[in-house]
Structures are given as C-alpha cells and as structure tokens.
Amino acid sequence: MKLATLKDGSRDGNLALVSRDLSRAVAVPEIARTLQEALDAWDVAAPRLEQLYAQLNEGKLARAVAFDPRQAHSPLPRAYQWADGSAYVNHVELVRQARGATMPAEFWTDPLMYQGGSDGFLAPMDDIVFPDESWGIDFEAEVAVITGDVPMGVTLQAAESQVLLLMLVNDVSLRNLIPAELSKGFGFFQGKPASSFSPVAVTPDELGGAWRGGKLHLPLITTLNGALFGHPNAGVDMTFSFPHLIAHAAKTRALAAGTIIGSGTVSNKQGGGPGRPAASGGVGYSCIAEQRTVETILAGQASTPFLRFGDRVRIEMLDDGGHSIFGAIDQTVSKS
C-alpha cells in the first residue's frame, strides 16, 4: 500500500492512503491520525489499512479526494530517529581517490553511518532555503526505509522483516561546511541540514520483484533544472543491503518503530571506472559532489558548481511501466 501525510497545520499532519496510481487519497483517522501512530501499532493498523487501500484502488471510497503532492508533508514530518548510511562504497572510494587517500579495507565490511537531525523534515516540494550559496549547497538522492520496533542485536534475517515502508530522500548537504566540521573528529551537524522525503511511502510488496535481497532494483532519477543529472540503479553496487544497515544501527541499541534508515548516495561503478555524466551517456550521479570528484580525478579540478539560488532539483523513481512509485521530490533552492 501507499501512505502519505497531508498538511493540516499541525506538526505531524494527517495520515492518508494514496491510490497505486497516485491520483486519489483518503484520510484514515478511524485507523490512525498520523503515520507514527500507525507504526506504533502496525500489526493492528496495517490489515485495516490494506482493506481500505483495496477499496480505494477499486474506486469504492466516495470520500476519496484528488491527491495533491503539494499538500503533502514528508511521510514522517518528524521522526524519532534518522540514521543515514553509506551503502554504496563506490561513492566513498571516489571521494577518497580524488584527494589521494587510500581506501581502508574495513569500509567494505563495516558500513559508515551518521545520525542526522529528525526533529523536522522539509516537505517534498518545500524550497531549500539558505542565506549563502558559498556553503556549497548539494542534493543527495537516496532510498530510505522506515522500520518497526527493532531489537538490539537483530540478525540480518530478522532485520528484513522490520522494513515496513520505503521512500526516497534528498539528503541536503552543505559541502563547504563539512570539511572543517569533520576535522574536529565529531561528525556531521551544520553540514547536514533538514532532509526531505518523497510524498509517498510504500510497503515492500508494492515494489514486486524490484525489491529483493533487501535492495530496491530500479533507477533513481535526478534532474537538475530539467536536465537529467543521474539515473543509477539503486540495486546495483549497493555494498550493504538495508537489512545490513538496520543490523548495524541496532548492534548496541534498539530502534523504535518509525526509525528512518537511509542508503546514502546511490552510486554505480559504471564499468569499473569513475563513470560518466548523464549528459555524456553515462548513468550520471546522485549528487553534485560525486560529479565534481570524477572531474577532479580525470581533469585535475572540478568544474560543475554546487547549487545556486533558483536551481531546481527533482528526484523520482519509476516502475517498469514508467509510472511514478513514490511521487517526486521537487525543490527549488532559494535565498533566505
């Protein structure tokens, strides 16, 4: 099934079911007022939601209305936890290669992960607002999952059953603030402002055979100012599956229902080399930083600028029939 959170003036919005074709929506306060409320009692709420979802897709719910993604929050407007991994080690390897650093062997066996701010996410069509372009504004197109209650020490096998919903992410990053921040040895904070998520979150069964092995095997499409920037396949070159990321996060702590785990920037090796931009016939990249990294490797310096005020970023994933699965993250960068 497909779920969204509609804006109603409150912090957490109203939970709604969205039809498979993203055309219709219906609020479900009789089951749960918010997505978090549904997640807290998923075993009870999910069967009732599935029943209504079937009726919605059959056109049997007279109270359904047209679904307008502009009226949608991120599925969880705020969350108990947002932990973003770096499952595509190719991305990390390229960044290190560009600065002449070797790749530690453990990066292939032990995932990187940071804990981001989750007290308030951007809506999928909100502007990305900052006072200064010089901060190095960038997008990161990713896939994320929402978990149920995950016990500490969960096994890989059990972790996959805790993937309740999937969605897309724009992990907004401020590249020029990150180096000084990381040099302190205490992780991201200012360099990782509020992220945004797709208008709709979907259960794994909606993805059919594209969801297998704890990975989503479909291209993740990013456009910048209407031009294709990247369409790498999210299931290719994903070193760590979502169950692996969940188990990593839960090694020393339990994860509450509603925890969001991100994949990190989707990145494909493209024939074993640094790859090619989409404009040159390659699958391109899911963030500007990776394209700049490849430019540095090949030409000695980066030439693609980071985002500027007025730039528009769109992130979307289509099924095999060309239909949008999650709706689009569609944001414009603007000056505060």
Q: Model-predicted segments: where are they?
A:
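Active-site pocket scaffolds in enzymes
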Residues: 261-309
